Structures are given as structure tokens and as C-alpha cells.
Amino acid sequence: MDMVKRFTVYLVNLDPVVNGKPRTSRPCVVISPDEMNRYLNTVIVAPLTSRKQDLPTRVPINFKLKPGQIALEQIRVLDKSRLIKPLGKLGDNTRDEVVRILGEMFSGG
């Protein structure tokens, strides 16, 4: 697999069984830094969802002409083998909002 880049949206296999045929896949954005992505076999991702909720951890997104949200309260660590294929990248404004909210979530304030 090519280098996994931060802020790239992938179709991800979220099914508990890795070696079987994927039954549960959804788009997720990679939020782990490129330095981690380069050296580790895992990535940190947040799922995209079309089910909107008014939460401070949600980032609005219009990806592939579909409105939705990035659910930062549902971040998870996955093995890179679960990344099925890249779907695109986040725009600059969306990236900035993801970084801002992650900073608030983990700043301890």
C-alpha cells in the first residue's frame, strides 16, 4: 500500500473479522500524523457519517457531494490492512476545523 497520508478519506473495513470478506465498511478520515503513518502498521481514523448530531466533536463535511459529519468522538486505531481504498482528501477549511477540535478534545482544558 502507498504511504497513508493524514486527512485522506479511505473506505475502511470496520468488520471485526479482518481475513473474511468485509461486511461493514464506511468512509473514514485518517487523523494520525504522517510521521506515525510512515513507521507504524496502524492509523488513527474518524468515521464519516450522514447521521447528523449537534455535538461539539462533529465537523460538518460535504464529501463527494454528500453532506455529513466527521465523528471525532468515535476515533479509533486500526491496522492499515483495513484500509480498502482512498476516496479523496479533506479541504483546507475542514482540515483546520478537525485540528482545532482535536486540540480542544486533548488539551485537558
Predicted regions: what is each one?
Residues 1-109:
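Conserved functional hotspots at enzyme active or ligand-binding sites that engage polyanionic ligands
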